[in-house]
Amino acid sequence: MIEVLTTDSQKLLHQLNTLLEQESRCQPKVCGLKLIESAHDNGLRMTARLRDFEVKDLLSLTQFFGFDTETFSLAVNLLDRFLSKMKVQAKHLGCVGLSCFYLAVKSIEEERNVPLATDLIRISQYRFTVSDLMRMEKIVLEKVCWKVKATTAFQFLQLYYSLIRETLPFERRNDLNFERLEAQLKACHCRIIFSKAKPSVLALAIIALEIQALKYVELTEGVECIQKHSKISGRDLTFWQELVSKCLTEYSSNKCSKPNGQKLKWIVSGRTARQLKHSYYRITHLPTIPETMG
């Protein structure tokens, strides 16, 4: 049980309590997301399809620069918070998305790894200017009430993973693959429907689904303890698990278009490459979700 875990687990539990307390703040408005989902695609209005394409582009940029999943998760949070409040025209989505991404990068990444705005725009292949980006950044900040930091599903995923791992014998602590869980969360972020889930519920749904596949009783007990502590109903968990399962099945199929950093490769000229740090133009393909070891 969580109540009798190790000292390290108690520290993790304290962090979890803090996240749970803050969770409801700085989240997208569900009613606004539903409006986007119901919008018809006429080339002018914001739609779920356009939003999802934009998030895939942000994921490509995240991989291109080698940024953390936490940065991507925060960028998606900022984007959805803004889109759920504002009526954004399709032609402005690229500028909005890149502004949210840049805010997340400056908030999470080390200063030495933050690219110049000019480089970010060039590599993203957009035609707007740095001034346009800065103006949009200010608008985004105003609409999110200058609250860039937010509780994300990635933070819950990290904590839940660490808590469950603490309950395992040392020799079995690598049974649950965090890289695989991260890849699954990234795939879910690329679907607007998952932004309607509470971050804690989405994170636990991803882990619970993975643990079901592992068929490891001790891990299942850990999930049940966390579910109870986080006050997540069985109905909610099952609902989102089913949606996650469907998403990952589609993501693994050839029908799903995946983010691709390759399209960014050609835009980096020799001159630009010399000006950028090595990590800036190191392309990493979006990995397929690692197979479960068994």
Swiss-Prot record:
<comment type="function">
    <text>May play a role in growth regulation. Is associated with G2/M phase arrest in response to DNA damage. May be an intermediate by which p53 mediates its role as an inhibitor of cellular proliferation.</text>
</comment>
<dbReference type="GO" id="GO:0030425">
    <property type="term" value="C:dendrite"/>
</dbReference>
<keyword id="KW-0539">Nucleus</keyword>
<keyword id="KW-0132">Cell division</keyword>
<comment type="similarity">
    <text>Belongs to the cyclin family. Cyclin G subfamily.</text>
</comment>
<dbReference type="GO" id="GO:0016538">
    <property type="term" value="F:cyclin-dependent protein serine/threonine kinase regulator activity"/>
</dbReference>
<protein>
    <recommendedName>
        <fullName>Cyclin-G1</fullName>
    </recommendedName>
</protein>
<dbReference type="GO" id="GO:0043025">
    <property type="term" value="C:neuronal cell body"/>
</dbReference>
<dbReference type="GO" id="GO:0007095">
    <property type="term" value="P:mitotic G2 DNA damage checkpoint signaling"/>
</dbReference>
<keyword id="KW-0131">Cell cycle</keyword>
<dbReference type="GO" id="GO:0000082">
    <property type="term" value="P:G1/S transition of mitotic cell cycle"/>
</dbReference>
<dbReference type="GO" id="GO:0048471">
    <property type="term" value="C:perinuclear region of cytoplasm"/>
</dbReference>
<dbReference type="GO" id="GO:0000307">
    <property type="term" value="C:cyclin-dependent protein kinase holoenzyme complex"/>
</dbReference>
<dbReference type="GO" id="GO:0006949">
    <property type="term" value="P:syncytium formation"/>
</dbReference>
<dbReference type="InterPro" id="IPR013763">
    <property type="entry name" value="Cyclin-like_dom"/>
</dbReference>
<dbReference type="GO" id="GO:0051301">
    <property type="term" value="P:cell division"/>
</dbReference>
<dbReference type="InterPro" id="IPR006671">
    <property type="entry name" value="Cyclin_N"/>
</dbReference>
<keyword id="KW-0195">Cyclin</keyword>
<dbReference type="GO" id="GO:0043066">
    <property type="term" value="P:negative regulation of apoptotic process"/>
</dbReference>
<dbReference type="InterPro" id="IPR039361">
    <property type="entry name" value="Cyclin"/>
</dbReference>
<dbReference type="GO" id="GO:0005634">
    <property type="term" value="C:nucleus"/>
</dbReference>
<dbReference type="GO" id="GO:0005737">
    <property type="term" value="C:cytoplasm"/>
</dbReference>
<dbReference type="InterPro" id="IPR036915">
    <property type="entry name" value="Cyclin-like_sf"/>
</dbReference>
<keyword id="KW-0498">Mitosis</keyword>
<dbReference type="Pfam" id="PF00134">
    <property type="entry name" value="Cyclin_N"/>
</dbReference>
<dbReference type="GO" id="GO:0009629">
    <property type="term" value="P:response to gravity"/>
</dbReference>
